[in-house]
C-alpha cells in the first residue's frame, strides 16, 4: 500500500512489520470498539510485541495520513466523553479488500463505515453514543443540528429491528433519531424514529434531519 510506504519514509520507521501489522489489525476491526491495550494484546497474541507508546504513534500516523478516522465514544446520559475505547473508520473501504482480501464480507460494518465517511463529508462531527449498556452507532453534530443514527445491513427480522431501535427509544431528548439500513423501501416512521434505505440516504434523496 503506497500510503504505508509514504508513512514509513516521512516518519523514518525502521520496523516496517509493526506498522503494517498495526494497519492490518485496524482494517480487520473497522467499526469495532478497540483501545491501545486491546490492540497491543491482539498483536502480542499473534506473535508481535510492541509498547503502547509505539502503537499510539503508528495509529496517529495512520490517522494523520487520512487513511483512518478515529471516532470517540460519548456518554449520552452523562454528557461526557469516555476515555476508554474508540472506533476507527476507513476513508475508502476498498483499501481493506486490497490489503486483506474479500473473504470476510461483513455488510453491517461496510454500511456503518460508508455512513461514517458520508457524515464526515457532509460536515458532521461524529461520536459513538453510549447509553447505559446500549450503543448508538453515531451521534452526529453539525452546528446546532444533532441526530442519533443506527446503521444495519438487514432489519427485516423482528429481533434485529428491536435491537436497533430500542437504544434510540431510550434517548429522552427531542433530536432526530434515524435507522439507516438496506430496506429497499420508502422512508417510514416508527414511534418517531425514521427508517431510511441506505441507498436513498447516500444519494441525498431523503429529508432525515
Each predicted region: which residue ranges?
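Accessory nucleic acid-recognition modules appended to NTPase machines
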Residues: 1-146
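Hydrophobic/aromatic beta-strand patches that form the interior of the parallel beta-sheet core
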Residues: 89, 149, 178-180, 194-196
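Residues at the C-termini of beta-strands that transition into short coil/loop
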Residues: 92-94, 130, 152, 181-183, ...
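Hydrophobic, well-ordered secondary-structure elements that form the walls
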Residues: 119, 137, 149, 168, ...
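Nucleic-acid nuclease catalytic cores
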Residues: 131, 172-193
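Short active-site-adjacent structural elements
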Residues: 136, 157-160, 185-190
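Active-site ExK catalytic segment of metal-dependent nucleases
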Residues: 146-156, 164
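Domain-level recognition of nuclease-like catalytic cores that cleave nucleotide substrates
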Residues: 184-209
Amino acid at each position: 500500500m503506497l500510503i504505508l510506504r509514504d508513512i514509513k519514509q516521512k516518519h523514518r520507521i525502521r520496523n516496517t512489520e509493526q506498522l503494517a501489522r498495526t494497519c492490518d489489525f485496524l482494517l480487520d476491526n473497522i467499526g469495532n470498539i478497540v483501545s491501545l491495550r486491546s490492540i497491543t494484546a491482539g498483536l502480542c497474541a499473534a506473535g508481535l510485541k510492541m509498547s503502547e507508546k509505539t502503537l499510539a504513534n503508528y495509529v496517529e500516523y495512520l490517522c494523520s495520513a487520512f487513511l483512518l478516522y478515529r471516532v470517540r465514544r460519548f456518554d449520552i446520559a452523562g454528557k461526557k466523553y469516555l476515555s476508554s475505547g474508540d472506533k476507527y473508520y476507513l476513508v475508502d473501504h476498498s483499501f481493506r479488500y486490497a490489503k486483506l482480501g474479500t473473504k470476510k464480507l461483513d455488510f453491517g460494518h461496510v454500511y456503518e463505515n460508508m455512513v461514517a465517511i458520508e457524515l464526515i463529508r457532509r460536515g458532521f462531527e461524529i461520536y459513538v453514543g453510549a447509553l447505559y449498556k446500549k450503543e448508538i452507532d453515531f451521534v452526529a453534530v453539525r452546528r446546532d443540528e444533532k441526530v442519533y443514527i443506527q446503521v444495519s445491513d438487514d432489519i427485516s427480522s423482528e429481533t434485529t429491528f428491536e435491537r436497533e431501535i430500542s437504544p434510540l427509544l431510550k434517548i429522552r431528548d427531542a433530536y432526530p433519531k434515524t435507522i439507516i439500513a438496506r430496506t429497499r423501501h420508502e422512508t417510514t416512521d416508527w414511534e418517531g424514529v425514521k427508517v431510511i434505505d441506505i441507498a436513498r440516504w447516500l444519494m441525498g434523496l431523503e429529508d432525515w434531519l
